[in-house]
């Protein structure tokens, strides 16, 4: 008995479904698994560098110490050999002598031992010009100390300390400007090929002039009033 509107029989439907199941079973496993299989990268796997292999320790790992005494013994075995007291003293003495020698050479003005800001013939010439001149800038430290002691010793003079300090600073500023201009002109005459700015040369000269003579580094190589060519 046929139903209205039905073109295929029930038996034909069963056969069609069996054929579909058979065709799906005949597909390869790679297609049936779908996205579970990753496609090849197209390039070889990157290997570790030789340096990593050299630094990688091979072999069994040493177990951790179980007690504090084992930990102390392991640290003692891994520690470098200790130097005797006489060897340590000799090393300290040699290091101290080397530092002293380098400082003496720097204070003497040897070019190889000077800091970068003091190296060069231009800087040496500026130092000689400043050291041969009596500068008002060098009076800042002793004058400040004297004014400080007077302030604490005689409180009644505190009203006069501020104006005195302002006058001292003004004199120092004027002296620094005069010194910087003079140094720049003399450097241009002696070193025509100098490319360093006048501002930096003036600051270098003023900074050295503001220090006390015995505290200058390197120590002065000329006397007061000497002629510097």
Curated annotation (Swiss-Prot):
<dbReference type="GO" id="GO:0005886">
    <property type="term" value="C:plasma membrane"/>
</dbReference>
<feature type="transmembrane region" description="Helical">
    <location>
        <begin position="137"/>
        <end position="157"/>
    </location>
</feature>
<dbReference type="InterPro" id="IPR021403">
    <property type="entry name" value="DUF3043"/>
</dbReference>
<protein>
    <recommendedName>
        <fullName>Uncharacterized protein ML0869</fullName>
    </recommendedName>
</protein>
<feature type="compositionally biased region" description="Basic residues">
    <location>
        <begin position="73"/>
        <end position="94"/>
    </location>
</feature>
<keyword id="KW-1133">Transmembrane helix</keyword>
<feature type="transmembrane region" description="Helical">
    <location>
        <begin position="159"/>
        <end position="179"/>
    </location>
</feature>
<keyword id="KW-0812">Transmembrane</keyword>
<keyword id="KW-0472">Membrane</keyword>
<feature type="region of interest" description="Disordered">
    <location>
        <begin position="1"/>
        <end position="102"/>
    </location>
</feature>
<dbReference type="Pfam" id="PF11241">
    <property type="entry name" value="DUF3043"/>
</dbReference>
<keyword id="KW-1003">Cell membrane</keyword>
């Amino acid at each position: 008995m046929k139903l209205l509107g039905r073109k295929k029989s029930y038996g034909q439907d069963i056969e069609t479904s069996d054929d579909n199941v058979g065709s799906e079973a005949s597909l390869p496993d790679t297609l049936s698994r779908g996205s579970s299989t990753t496609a090849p990268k197209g390039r070889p796997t990157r290997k570790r560098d030789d340096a990593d292999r050299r630094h990688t320790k091979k072999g069994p790992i040493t177990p951790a110490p179980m007690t504090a005494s084992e930990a102390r013994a392991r640290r003692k075995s891994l520690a470098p050999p200790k130097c005797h007291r006489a060897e340590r003293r000799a090393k300290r003495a040699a290091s101290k002598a080397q530092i002293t020698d380098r400082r003496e050479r720097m204070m003497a003005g040897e070019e190889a031992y000077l800091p970068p800001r003091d190296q060069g013939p231009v800087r040496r010439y500026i130092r000689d010009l400043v050291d041969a001149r009596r500068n008002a800038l060098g009076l800042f430290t002793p004058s400040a100390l004297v004014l400080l002691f007077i302030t604490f010793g005689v409180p009644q003079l505190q009203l006069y300390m501020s104006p005195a300090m302002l006058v001292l600073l003004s004199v120092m500023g004027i002296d620094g400007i005069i010194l910087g201009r003079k140094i720049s002109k003399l450097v241009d005459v002696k070193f025509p090929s100098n490319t360093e700015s006048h501002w930096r040369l003036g600051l270098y000269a003023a900074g050295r002039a503001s220090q006390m003579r015995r505290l200058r580094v390197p120590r002065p190589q000329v006397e007061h009033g000497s002629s510097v060519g």
